[in-house]
Amino acid sequence: KTFLGPVILATGHSARDVYRWLAANKVPIEAKGIAVGVRLEHPAGLIDQIQYHNRNGRGKYLPAAEYSFVTQVEGRGVYSFCMCPGGFIVPAASGPEQVVVNGMSPSNRGSRWSNSGMVVEIQPEDIMNDERLTMNDEAEGSHPELAVLRFQEELERQCWLQGGRRQTAPAQRMADFTRRKLSYDLPESSYSPGLISSPLHFWMPEFITGRLSQ
């Protein structure tokens, strides 16, 4: 029998070789939008005070407070993502020469930090003219549908370079980021490989940093 129904290709996380194989074998594919941004970290007690409207925080019985943020800036969504109350920032790279971070909370949400992704919606047309971060790969030059993938890879590599070619994460105080200033010191962090001060506003694309700053 001939199967004529749909086929779902469940590639999982960071299966970039699969998409390159599909493009090389002339399987029709198209780019989709992604979300790119930073991870914010705060003292858990500060978020408790704000969310519970109590300068004494959450007390003995309330859980570590969460928050959610959603807005539109210049026609693109800007929103919090994967908020981790009483949690940690952890390395999440899936390949060499990458720095990627994620967040997690233990079951007791007992860390003295809380963190959240803060991301900007990115559409393929946003990056087509970004020569700084779109890799000039002649082998893939005939596959514009891979442009978003290359953009993501190069941004992860830039993070690795800015981190000193280690898993140290480039970081900036939030107030300095919005004012476009280098942070001369950084607060203590839950991210165990450590942080290094870096002007994120300078080397990340303006269509990301500008919307995040607003």
Show which residues each predicted segment covers.
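Residues forming the flavin
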Residues: 1-214
